[in-house]
């Protein structure tokens, strides 16, 4: 991904969509999604955003495969961001919590030093400036651009018969819009000159720590 101000904004939008998609779709009331998952034996409903993927996950009982597929495909097809403003508070809270964690501040500084101008140099949740300027229209556009079938993958693990499950999944998830997500420009990592040393200072007394970073094999 090319790291620009637009890319930072996209990362923020994805985080906000995560929070909203857990709670709403066209045919349910706020928080009803979680109750539906629980009703059909599900638990652990959550979402996560990393530098390279967005993941929605939960556990559920195999006998409710039909209901699970219907519910989870629906939120990828007909989400309604009616809780946009209230759910921003959840994102703000997470941003503040992360900012209070000393290790997180140090890691952000190190990532910015060793990965700039690559996207890995920027916090996933975005900057405070980004979070203070939300636009619902941008969120809708992000969803339309990136939530297409060719940009998704479904992973199931557990005790079930794959031959019986495939028709259920195809019926539910084939309703997701087809299309291709926007092509992203590749950004090369800056050269790593072997041993580099940097010091990070924060106004916290009596705490000293050392971290070691290694350039791994490219994905």
Where are these regions (language model features)?
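Conserved short hydrophobic interaction patches
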Residues: 75, 171-176
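Non-catalytic beta-strand/loop surface segments
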Residues: 1-63, 85, 95-151, 175-219
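M16/insulysin-pitrilysin zinc metalloprotease superfamily fold
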Residues: 1, 59-88
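Extracytoplasmic/secreted cell-surface and envelope-processing proteins
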Residues: 162-166
């Amino acid at each position: 991904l090319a790291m620009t101000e637009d890319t930072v904004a996209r990362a923020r939008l994805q985080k906000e969509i995560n929070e909203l998609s857990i709670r709403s779709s066209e045919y349910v009331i706020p928080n009803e999604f979680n109750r539906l998952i629980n009703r059909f034996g599900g638990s652990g409903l959550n979402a996560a955003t990393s530098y390279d993927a967005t993941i929605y996950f939960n556990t559920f009982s195999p006998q409710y495969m039909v209901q699970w597929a219907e519910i989870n495909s629906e939120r990828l097809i007909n989400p309604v961001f009616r809780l946009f403003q209230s759910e921003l508070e959840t994102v703000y809270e997470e941003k503040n919590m992360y900012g209070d964690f000393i290790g997180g501040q140090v890691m952000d500084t190190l990532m910015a030093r060793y990965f700039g101008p690559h996207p890995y140099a920027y916090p996933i949740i975005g900057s405070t400036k980004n979070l203070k300027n939300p636009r619902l229209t941008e969120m809708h556009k992000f969803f339309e651009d990136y939530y297409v079938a060719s940009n998704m993958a479904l992973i199931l693990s557990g005790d079930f018969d794959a031959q019986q499950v495939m028709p259920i999944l195809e019926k539910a998830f084939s309703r997701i819009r087809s299309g291709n997500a926007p092509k992203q420009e590749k950004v090369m990592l800056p050269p790593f000159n072997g041993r580099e040393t940097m010091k990070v200072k924060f106004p916290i007394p009596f705490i000293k720590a050392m971290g070691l970073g290694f350039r791994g094999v490219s994905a």
